[in-house]
Amino acid sequence: MEIDGFQQLDLEKSVPSKKTTPKRIIHFVDGDIMEEYSTEEEEEEEKEEQSTNSTLDPSKLSWGPYLRFWAGRIASTSFSTCEFLGGRFAVFFGLTQPKYQYVLNEFYRIQNKKSDNKSERRGSKAQAAEVPNEKCHLEAGVQEYGTIQQDVTEAIPQ
């Protein structure tokens, strides 16, 4: 019997293992070929998707789960339909702004108006403080530029 077991192991080793087929084969213009293989993570994700996509067969459920199944399906379908149609009706009737957006717009408009009035008042004060005789500019080399006029004899100590 050990010989049979030994022969079975040899047969298992001699049988070619599962050959991996490429997920995609990409042919480039210059003639190169690239084979893309799926990873273990991708294979696990595909298996999970298949298990979640397999829906329950309502005919095999008892009455309680059967009613819950259909109630859930009707509720989710109704909600999705109302959500879709609500968005379409809102666009059709022009209800695309938030409910109280007009109040916010008015508030910001009034704030901007007040700040403009304040800046105008400040600007008018600054204009009044300017030199009344702007046409008479002093040259940079003049001794009196930027100083208080004093008698030259008083400024020089003896």
From Swiss-Prot:
Disulfide bonds: none
Pfam families: FAM177
Compositionally skewed regions (Acidic residues) per UniProt: 36-48
Region (Disordered) residue spans: 36-59
InterPro entries, alphabetized: FAM177
Family (UniProt): Belongs to the FAM177 family.
Protein name: Protein FAM177B
Organism whose genome encodes this protein: Homo sapiens (Human)
Gene that this polypeptide is encoded by: FAM177B
